[in-house]
Structures are given as structure tokens and as C-alpha cells.
Amino acid sequence: MPFTLGQRWISDTESELGLGTVVAIDVRMVTLLFPATGENRLYARNDSPITRVMFNPGDTITHHEGWQLKVEEVSEENGLITYIGTRLDTEETGVSMREVLLDSKLTFSKPQDRLFAGQIDRMDRFALRFRARKYQSEQFRLPWSGLRGIRASLIPHQLHIAYEVGQRHAPRVLLADEVGLGKTIEAGMIIHQQLLSGRAERILIVVPESLQHQWLVEMLRRFNLRFSLFDDSRYSEALLDSTNPFETEQMVICSLDFVRRNKQRLEQLADASWDLLVVDEAHHLAWSEEAPSREYQVIEQLAEHIPGVLLLTATPEQLGQQSHFARLRLLDPDRFHDYEEFINEQQKYRPIADAVTLLLGGERLTDDKLNLLGELINEQDIEPLLKAANSQTEDSEAARQELVTMLMDRHGTSRILFRNTRNGVKGFPHRVLHQIKLPLPTQYQTAIKVSGIMGAKKSLEARAKDMLYPEQIYQEFEGENATWWNFDPRVEWLLNYLIANRNEKVLVICAQAATALQLEQVLREREAIRAAVFHEGLSLIERDRAAAYFASEEDGAQVLLCSEIGSEGRNFQFACQLVMFDLPFNPDLLEQRIGRLDRIGQNREIQIMVPYLENTAQAVLVRWYHEGLDAFEHTCPTGRTIYDSGYQELITYLATPSEQEGLDEFIHTCRQQHEGLKLQLEQGRDRLLEMHSNGGEHGQELAEIIADQDNDVNLVSFALNLFDIVGINQEDRSDNLIVLTPSDHMLVPDFPGLPQDGCTVTFDREQALSREDAQFVSWEHPIIRNGLDLILSGDTGSCAVSLLKNKALPVGTLLAELVYVVEAQAPKHLQLTRFLPPTPVRMLMDKNGTNLAAQVEFESFNRQLNAVNRHTSSKLVNAVQQEVHAMLQQAEALVEEQARLLIEAAKHEADDKLSAELARLEALKAVNPNIRDDEIETLEHNRKMVLENLNQAGWRLDAIRLVVVTHQ
């Protein structure tokens, strides 16, 4: 093409320079000035990597002064172009703009503009973009979004609760599962769903101080959620950046004590516009009508300001009715305002729970029971259902299930309370206790005697705690150089036990970090036993490494030595051997120790080894835990109650273990108390609430669906393709692990979700669960989600040129592969993507205007194509520009009809689903006062907004690939 001064061109290789102007021409060279950057470039007149910029009618162009022109006509004179059209700011028609006046900062965002401007991308990027569109659209439509990406086993009751609650607007619920059933995971899944769906963006978690790091680790390791931990120093730091420090982060964890101590902090927290509040250990918030505790008032104030609230607490039976009422009052103060009224209401629900037990028992119902069911359900036309339920026909079971569902909807607190018990959940292992009685060394006997004399002024509690750990008493007197491990028979026993069980992973827990460190040294030096140490002095990364070393099957540690605090929140269900080198002071800590292995998903019996020294406080405590509470071999929901009531007697026996008088009677009394309380708990079981919380078949179905999706080969191939194109280094390791590290040639210098020092990932859920250092990659993992956003929000792969070698077609045959996107714009919380995600519509146009996409599938077509270099591509495009314009016009008419059908289908689906949801809630409100008015109002408003936004839906061209037939 001949050059003329003033013409506008763009560089094919340096598009960031913007629009260039021809400023000098000689026989062989042409000079372009790029005003946007002030740089000059010299090019050969023939075959140089630059493309002439020419716009067409219908395009919108920008003047260098900033105003825009909608092009209606294009004229050319002496090689220079003038555009004529309507000025958009003044609506003046017939306005001319010479090409020399075009804005030099011009960027081409439309795929066809980029194609004609020579900004042509690689063929593999086009394919990646189409796949990204296709997979993203499929993922948006799945209703269990937020549940699949968790790094946890697929436990039906957890999935059911998370799905039920996570789908609600501003959920306000009480999670009261028994210990070991995974309340933290349930809360994390609810948070994850609320964040992914856009229902929540700002999350506040308030926990006891000792659990802050556990929550921080759990949220990051299991859900890839990066929370910020606010303590005094972080608060002071943030105060420099903002008048309200809590507005500097979207997701915050802080301790209850941190908030309670300072009135200003509480006010700032309440004003920080959170969407969801999560409170752990909520049963410690003391309340009475006359004098609620300061802690309770703090959470009450936050709950008044924050729309969504999750309270994690002990089971209602453990709490007692008044304490249980106090938690419900935090969730819905209007509904639960009077304790007496609450008690009366609860008593009315007893017959409902009994009726469910009856229906589930499968026994024939008496006339009295049938009348009771009729009264409880109080619906018209209930008679045929009752008759079917009581018949011997095959319809009987279905009728009973329907009646149970109707009762469940009417159950007082079932919508805001979820409680699972171990009795109602299958999958827990047996626990077997092995007591190893060992002689008390003379060194310890002497140290204990001296300690008794010197510590006479200590409190009874302090002496009791001292007596549990004789090695510490000995070390206190002998100083730093005391080598208690040389004579302590527990050490010798541990060495022999580990040698005898070389093939078993063994978890050893002791009270103090110092003990764990000393034991590691002994195991290493005396028997070369590989051990990892886990204590509170380690950073999170060091703990992860220690846990991964223990988990590794190849060259991993045989033993993990844990301190009490260091083991909080970590689970090692791949091991089944637990050694308690000493014993904790209260039953909650004992259950926490066993809970490291006794989790759902543990598939072997747990062997609990307790080596203890005779005639010591350890011997007393072993007996009390085992004979008094049965706390080793079964979970002990009564433990805390009995511990509190018998505390004084217990610490007396621990402080003076040589005086055993009355111990047998004390243990016997505790056992009777335990059995009595246990019976009360069992009788008080609310079968209806358990069914509602457990989810039954629904939970099982969710687990199976997600397990099937775990094996998605599309994810693996897409992810590896994405990593290649983005420029992330991949190194295969054994055990289905891949190490990802940033490279120097990435599409973006800092890929979101990929740490600077890289990370280890796996696509295998089981592998991720057994390897603490491996991240579980799913469609919901930040690396994949950010990768999809990176590709789709930019121009990557939006235009390409390929060659098709096919002798059945004439040389030079032109095909245009077009990818349109049908989409609607709306606030994220409306979740429009459930009904109309950005949906790709692929077309393969020939020059006659025929769409061949239905006959030619994308992947098989893509495999037949060959790449073309950018320079040749640009020349090809220039040669066929008119034909491409014609093809685009023909495609526009065809895509309009397809888009209309998609939008209409989305509107029908949205209307049907949201109307049904609304009708169900309104019907329930008539029989169950726990349906909040604001929930119904929000749903009604959202339905209206969703339909309005779907009416505004449109479509656009997202990517274009020109395919030219060749025979070579």
C-alpha cells in the first residue's frame, strides 16, 4: 500500500505505542511518530510489521480532543481518509474528522478492530479463550457452587447444612453439631458460597483468642480464603490509614477479648458494614434476663448491625434451655423475646418430634395418632395422605416421607438451628484404650517430695497441675541440664513401641512444647527414628511443613510430636495410633486430642496408648477419665458438666495422689452422674431436628455429585493449558503433585493466587487431604478463577488467523469462526449467572452466509488447523477485509435469534424458580414464625430486579478466527 504523510498506522509488534502517524517517507524507508509515547520508529516500505488503521461505518472513533464520532460514511482522497458521521456529545450530524486528528491513545477492544489493526493473537490462545468461556458458563449454572472447591472430605451432613444455609439471603443460624462433626468446615463452606455468589463480600469472624490462628489456617488451607488477623498492633497500624481500621480489609478475624476491651473498637466494628458475622464458641457468652455478660452484649450489638449471623456453639442439650434461648435471641430478638413463652412453645414441639419418630418407625398408626398428625399439620385434604401412610401399599413409604417433610416445615427452630449428633451420623471409628502402667522412678519420687514441701503455699489447683507433669518438677530443681529422659520409663516404652510399629504413623501429644522437642532429640539420637515436631512456637508455614513431612508416605516422618496448643485445629485421620505421653487437665482437651484422629473419614480403629506412672496424679486422672467418664473410648458430652461439679474433689486427689481414700466412691459417683446425664440427652434427642440437620438423601446426593465432578478431565487439561499459556512453570512430582512457580515471561508479572515462591498443587482431593503442603485445585480455586478472569477480561485470544489443510476445499476458501457472548449486566448479589451466565454462541460462517458450526465441532476442527505467523496473518486479513465485513453482517442476523431464545429461556427459568421459592416461603410463614419478613421482602425485590436485568440482556462479539484453506 502506498504511504502518504498524515496516514495513521499501528505497529503489529508494539501495539502499546498506540496510533502512529506517517511523518517522513523516502525511497526505501518510512518514519512513524507515535504521539501517545513521543517515540519515532523507522520501517522499511516493503513488508514491514505495521498495519493501516481504517474504520468502517458503524464504528465509534475518538477525536484527539476527547469527543466521539459515530461513523456513517468513509471517504478517501490522495491516500488520506476522512470520516463523516454524528458527533455523540452534541448529536450534530454530518461532522467530518480527518484521520490525522484521531486520538493517538487509541486501543482496539472489539475483536474485529484488533484483527483489522493487525493485533492478531496466537491460535492456541483463541482456543483457550473459547474453552474458558464454555467452562465458565457451565460452572456458573451449577447450584452447588462454593461446595466443590473445599479441601475437605465430602461429608453428607456438612454439605447439606452448607447448601441449605449458603443459598439464603443474610442467613442467621445456629450451628450446634456435636464435637468432631465439623462445625468450622460447615461455617467455612457457608462463607465460601456466600462470597462466590456475591451475597456477601465483607466477613467478620469473632473467636476466643486461642482459636484465632486455627481459624486463620482453616480458612486459608481448606477454602483459600485469606483473612486478616486483627490484634492490638494490627489495629494501631491500620488506624494510620483509615479513621475506621476495619474498613481497610474485607475479611477479618479478631478475638472476642480484643473487641470487649475497647468501646471505640466495638463501635468501629459495628459501623464497618459487614455482610456476615461468624462467632465461634458462642456457648461461652453468658446471659440472664437481669444481667447479660459484657461478652454477650458485644455480640448482641454486632448482630444488630450485621445482616447475616452464624453462631457456632455446643449442642442445646449441653447448654441448657436458658442458654440455648440466649443464642436464639441473638439471631432473632423479635421472635425470641420472652423466655417463658419460648419454653411453652418448645413443649408444644414435643408431640411433633414424637410424631416423626412414629412415622419413621414404620409402625401402624392408631386413630389417636392419626388425629394428632391431622391436628399438627392442619392442612386441608390431608386425609388421603394419612390413609396412604397407614396402608400396607407401596405408596406408604412415600406418604410417610411427605408427612415428615410437612412436619419439618412446621418445626419451631428447624430453620435457624442445625444440630447433628454422632448417633445420627454414620462413619465414626471405634476407639480402643491401652493403659500402660509404669513404675515411678526414684528421681521423680524425690523431686515430688521436695516440691510438696516447697510448694506448700501454692494453690490446690497449681499443685494439682504440677503433679501431672513430674518431668517438669524434676527439671525445675535440677536446672537446664536435667536429663529426665534418661530414666523416665515412658521414654523407653515409647522407643520400643515405635520400633515395634515401624510401618505405622504415630501421633504423640504432650502438654508442653519443650517436652515434644526433647523427645524428638531422644528418638533421633538413640534410634534414628524420623520425627516431626509441631508446637505453638512454629510459624504457620513451618507447621505446614512438619505436617506434610508426617503425611508423606515416601521418606516421611514416622512420628509427629505435638504440644497441646500446637495441635489445635489440625487433623491427621490418615494415622490411627495416638500416644498420650501425659494427660490434659480437663475432658474438653482430652476430646480435642483424640479428635485429631477421631474424625469422620477415619476408616480404622483408633488405638489410644496412655503410658502413665503409678502412684501419681496421672494414675488418678487415667482412672477418672476412663472409669468415671468413659472419655477415652467414647465421646463425652457430659464431661464438662461433671468436671465442673466435681472439680474441688478432683484437684484434691490430683494434688495429693498418695492419699487415695474415697477415690473409688468419687469415681463411682461420677460414673452414675455420667450415665444419668447421658440417658437424659438420649431421651431429649429431637429426631425431627436431626433429620432436618442431617439432610438424609439430599446430603448423600450432593456428596456423590461433587465426587463425580472431582474426576473432571476437562479441568486438568484446561488448567495445564492455562498454565502453559500464562507462562507458569510446571514441575511434575510423584503422588499426582505439580509444583507451580512464576516465570519471567508470564502474561502478567504477578499472577493472582500464585505465591512468589510458587506452590504445590494436586487435582486429587484425597491427596490434598493427606498432604498439608498441597493445594487442592478445582474450578473454584483462586488460580483457576483468576486465570479465567485474566483471559476473559482482557483481549487474550480475541482474534487469530489459522490455515486449514484440506484438499476437498478450493485453495483460498475463507471461513470465519465467530464466538459471540450473550450476557446481562447486574449487581453480583442478584446471581443472574444462575439463569444467564455469559454464554458463548459459536458460529462458523462461509462466504455464502451459511453457519456450519453445528456440523463442525470445535475441538476436532481446532486439531486440523495450523498456526500462521503474525506478519503473514496481517497481510491475509488486509487481502480479505471486505469479505470478512460481509460475513460479520450475515452472522449478526443469525446470532440475534439465538440470543433471543437464550434470554427468553433464562427469563422463564428465573421467573419459575424465584416465584416457587417465594411461594414456598410465604406458605411456610403461615405455619412457622421463623421465616423472617425481610427474607421474603428481599426475595420479592430480587425477583423483580432479576427479571428487569434479564430484559436488558444483550450480546456482543467476543472472539474471531479467520481460517484460510491451503493445500500445502
From Swiss-Prot:
Ranges for domain Helicase ATP-binding: 164-334
Alphabetical list of Pfam families matching this protein: Helicase_C, RapA_C, SNF2-rel_dom, Tudor_1_RapA, Tudor_RapA
UniProt entry keywords in alphabetical sequence: Activator, ATP-binding, DNA-binding, Helicase, Hydrolase, Nucleotide-binding, Transcription, Transcription regulation
Gene Ontology biological process terms, A to Z: regulation of DNA-templated transcription
EC number, UniProt record: 3.6.4.-
Binding site for ATP: 177-184
Residues passing through the membrane, by range: none
InterPro entries per record: Helicase_ATP-bd, Helicase_C-like, Helicase_RapA, P-loop_NTPase, RapA_C, SNF2-like_sf, SNF2/RAD54-like_C, SNF2_N
SUPFAM superfamilies linked: P-loop containing nucleoside triphosphate hydrolases
Keyword Secreted: no
Domain Helicase C-terminal: 490-664
Residue numbers covered by motif DEAH box: 280-283
PROSITE patterns: HELICASE_ATP_BIND_1, HELICASE_CTER
A Gene Ontology molecular function term of the record: helicase activity
Presence of keyword Nucleotide-binding: yes
Function, as annotated: Transcription regulator that activates transcription by stimulating RNA polymerase (RNAP) recycling in case of stress conditions such as supercoiled DNA or high salt concentrations. Probably acts by releasing the RNAP, when it is trapped or immobilized on tightly supercoiled DNA. Does not activate transcription on linear DNA. Probably not involved in DNA repair.
Family of this protein: Belongs to the SNF2/RAD54 helicase family. RapA subfamily.
Complexes and interactors: Interacts with the RNAP. Has a higher affinity for the core RNAP than for the holoenzyme. Its ATPase activity is stimulated by binding to RNAP.
Protein name: RNA polymerase-associated protein RapA
Naturally occurring in which organism (per UniProt): Yersinia enterocolitica serotype O:8 / biotype 1B (strain NCTC 13174 / 8081)
